């Protein structure tokens, strides 16, 4: 489905929060949206792998990596796992790696930056907790909408029917 965050802001500005423009798009899909599942972890991705094993249909994984860019939290293997399990997208407040491969995987990915160094594979962190970055607080089960222009957050799903005809 087509979405345009600029148009959504024009229509729903009083109902949404706009994430600061600190993210770049890296995945094979430039637009994505869904109900968020949150993870808070630092320089390790074991918990991320566990969550991505779940059915992700209609869901976006939102990872608070503390803004650290020394180790990548998402790589091609995890992105492919997410795509295979139907996840709509991944937003990483941290780093990712293997950009050439990520471009060819059918999933939306937004992150701060790429780096070639991988993360630890320990399952340390928290899931389904509120996280704060980019000037907004994300709560589990909020809805996020992302495209090349930006990321917006809503407590309720937005009506996207008018975009179906575009």
Swiss-Prot record:
GO terms for molecular function: endoribonuclease inhibitor activity; enzyme binding. Homotrimer. Binds to both RNA-binding sites in the C-terminal region of Rne and to RhlB. InterPro entries: RraA (IPR010203), RraA/RraA-like (IPR005493), RraA/RraA-like_sf (IPR036704), RraA_gpbac (IPR014339). GO terms for cellular component: cytoplasm. Keywords: Cytoplasm. It comes from Histophilus somni (strain 129Pt) (Haemophilus somnus). Belongs to the RraA family. It is found in: Cytoplasm. This is Regulator of ribonuclease activity A. GO terms for biological process: regulation of RNA metabolic process. It holds the Pfam family RraA-like. The keyword Cytoplasm applies. The keyword Lipid metabolism does not apply. Globally modulates RNA abundance by binding to RNase E (Rne) and regulating its endonucleolytic activity. Can modulate Rne action in a substrate-dependent manner by altering the composition of the degradosome. Modulates RNA-binding and helicase activities of the degradosome. Its main location: cytoplasm. The gene is rraA. NCBIfam families: NOT-MenG (TIGR01935), PRK09372.1 (NF006875), RraA_entero (TIGR02998).
């Amino acid at each position: 489905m087509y979405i345009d965050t600029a148009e959504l802001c024009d229509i729903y500005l009083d109902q949404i929060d706009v994430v600061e423009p600190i993210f770049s798009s890296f995945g094979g899909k430039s637009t994505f949206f869904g109900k968020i599942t949150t993870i808070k972890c630092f320089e390790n991705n074991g918990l991320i792998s566990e969550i991505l094993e779940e059915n992700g249909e209609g869901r976006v994984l939102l990872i608070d990596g503390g803004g650290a860019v020394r180790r990548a939290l998402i790589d091609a293997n995890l992105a492919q796992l997410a795509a295979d399990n139907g996840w709509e997208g991944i937003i990483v407040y941290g780093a990712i790696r293997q950009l050439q491969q990520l471009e060819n995987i059918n999933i939306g990915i937004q992150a701060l930056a790429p780096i070639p160094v991988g993360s630890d594979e320990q399952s340390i962190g928290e899931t389904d907790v509120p996280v704060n970055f980019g000037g907004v607080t994300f709560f589990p089960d909020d809805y996020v909408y992302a495209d090349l222009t930006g990321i917006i957050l809503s407590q309720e799903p937005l009506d996207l029917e008018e975009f179906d005809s575009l």
